[in-house]
UniProtKB/Swiss-Prot annotation:
Positions bearing the site annotation: Increases basicity of active site His: E129
Family recorded in the similarity comment: Belongs to the CDP-alcohol phosphatidyltransferase class-I family.
EC supergroup of this enzyme: transferase
Residues at which Mg(2+) 2 binds: D111, D132, D136
Protein name according to UniProt: Cholinephosphotransferase 1
Summary of the function given for this chain in its UniProt record: Catalyzes the final step of de novo phosphatidylcholine (PC) synthesis, i.e. the transfer of choline phosphate from CDP-choline to the free hydroxyl of a diacylglycerol (DAG), producing a PC. It thereby plays a central role in the formation and maintenance of vesicular membranes.
Cytoplasmic domain ranges by topology: 2-62, 119-125, 180-190, 249-265, 317-329, 377-406
Membrane topology of this protein: Multi-pass membrane protein
Pathway this chain belongs to: Phospholipid metabolism; phosphatidylcholine biosynthesis; phosphatidylcholine from phosphocholine: step 2/2
Pfam families attached to this UniProt entry: CDP-OH_P_transf
Reaction(s) catalysed by this chain's protein: CDP-choline + a 1,2-diacyl-sn-glycerol = a 1,2-diacyl-sn-glycero-3-phosphocholine + CMP + H(+); 1-octadecanoyl-2-(5Z,8Z,11Z,14Z-eicosatetraenoyl)-sn-glycerol + CDP-choline = 1-octadecanoyl-2-(5Z,8Z,11Z,14Z-eicosatetraenoyl)-sn-glycero-3-phosphocholine + CMP + H(+); 1-hexadecanoyl-2-(9Z-octadecenoyl)-sn-glycerol + CDP-choline = 1-hexadecanoyl-2-(9Z-octadecenoyl)-sn-glycero-3-phosphocholine + CMP + H(+); 1-hexadecanoyl-2-(4Z,7Z,10Z,13Z,16Z,19Z-docosahexaenoyl)-sn-glycerol + CDP-choline = 1-hexadecanoyl-2-(4Z,7Z,10Z,13Z,16Z,19Z-docosahexaenoyl)-sn-glycero-3-phosphocholine + CMP + H(+)
Lumenal side: 84-93, 151-160, 208-222, 282-293, 340-346
Amino acid sequence: MAAGAGARPAPRWLKALTEPLSAAQLRRLEEHRYTAAGVSLLEPPLQLYWTWLLQWIPLWMAPNSITLLGLAINMLTTLVLISYCPTVTEEAPYWTYLLCALGLFIYQSLDAIDGKQARRTNSCSPLGELFDHGCDSLSTVFMAVGASIAVRLGTHPDWLFFCSFIGMFMFYCAHWQTYVSGVLRFGKVDVTEIQIALVIVFVLSTFGGATMWDYTIPILEIKLKILPVLGVVGGAIFSCSNYFHVILHGGVGKNGSTIAGTSVLSPGLHIGIIIILAIMIYKKSATNLFEKHPCLYTLMFGCVFAKVSQKLVIAHMTKSELYLQDTVFIGPGLLFLDQYFNNFVDEYIVLWIAMVISSLDMMRYFSALCLQISRHLHLSIFKTSCHQAPEQVQVLPPKSHQNNMD
């Protein structure tokens, strides 16, 4: 080869793995403006706490570092609880519930101030918005698992399945309506209220033990654990009705389409396939896979959900179509095929294989996405820099603390 000859271009498949976004998508990303509206019930009093907390955060600490630290603490405390209660029917030591309460509260606090830190350091950017929502998608899964363990919901497998997946569905719907309308809307009862409610559940389990939720309420003749479940059902109905009111009334695109000019119903295919596969595998399992390994089962599908949610977020930010074909469905597909062939391989082994594939695929995609955007915008993911992109945040009145994208 002649000296000075250019290096051979990378294969297309390798480029697709390391650079998920096209040049056109990156150009549209530069034009993206984060727009949010709404104020929740607990926001005004908590704003005082968040403002106080922010003053203790050093200026050199990047907003994304704050977000990641909160996620890591939440995941770690939940994994400790999972290690004691893998089937969600056991009772863990009291300190594990207290640890989860502290972990979730710390996560909520850090998640609320990362955007404040971004504005404080003049480092707001589309990268921060993506990173924040990407971490939130994974945290949603761990919160559902931890809360289910705290009330020993494994004694009611169907309710456990519902509560494990409804949080994922609502998170996805929140960003689905954003993809349609271009505005991320927050209700009177939103993620902050849910997080505080879960902290209270963990505290109650700390002092009363997880078995306290098995107490039968006189007259009503229902177990105490059904009350938080009914709260989840009511909240899901209320929130989803608001989401679909926005979705079904048309988007901001041409002829009432999404922000990308696609059908307002198209994102439903992705979350629909995930939930249908989860239900089919749960109900058709000859070895009661979900009942025996609910935490692993939920975490595996949670990784699938997290990647699909991340794709929806970036599709909104780049005004792009959300494609259905994706490696994210390989893990659940293996479980489905194993059942189709009468459990040729032990389901538990296949579940672990699916977990490894799904988690690695999700992390690979999210990492590649963040690295590509950071290179394009000349940003550092975990350091503040004088080369940060200009602030692109628009808050619709009334002002909301949730509008904290960095």
